[in-house]
Structure formats: C-alpha cells, structure tokens
C-alpha cells in the first residue's frame, strides 16, 4: 500500500478531492467511528497530545465530532452539520498552532490503522481516503516550525 506523506511548503493549499463514498459502504458508520477512535487513542500517547482536549469528556466529544465529519464527507448522514453547522474546518482549527511536523505526526498515526484495513477494504479505497487525509491536512497547517 502506498501511504506516503506529501511534503508541502508553508501556505500551500493543494486542491482537495473528497474520498470515495464506497469506503463508508465497506466500513459502515461503526467501522469508521472505530478508525477515528483508534486514531484518537494513538494521539493520547503521541507528541501532539497537547493539541487535544485534556478533559476526558471533551476528548471523547472531539473524537465524536471527527467521526461525524468523516461520515458526512464520505456521503453518510450529515451528523456534523446537524450538530455543529457548516464544517469550515480551516476556521475551526485556526485557534490551534498546527505546524508541518504536527501534521506529519497526525498522519503517521493513521498509517497503521489504515494498513490494518487491507483484509476487508479494497486497497484503492484506502489509498483514496489516505490521499484525502494527506491533502486536506495541509489546509490545517497555520504555523511555521519554530
């Protein structure tokens, strides 16, 4: 599987292509929530933990919102919009100092999770989702490295 992190220049905003909705058909909402749950649990033990809520209830709520967003972006029920309004993810992430290296860690934590799907999800669907994460995450970078 080809899950390589794309390096970008600060301020670069490549065009984003939504992931293929068939991924949600293979995983279902529960399966997608499990991917996000696994990712957030990996974040707990990572160097970017400080960027996420420290309060357990708030951390769980952030996890739920992330899963809601991905379900919606994959053509599922618009949970995110119903509860939070329009996604506007760049604006929602603006209060946080997101550097290229923080993005890299965030993506690296997804790699083993996505690789673990190979036995039940067609590889092209996983790679399309990865490409979405890879490009979409560049839009969240708002701080240069120190």
Language-model-detected regions and their locations in the chain:
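Core of compact, soluble alpha-helical bundle domains
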Residues: 1-146
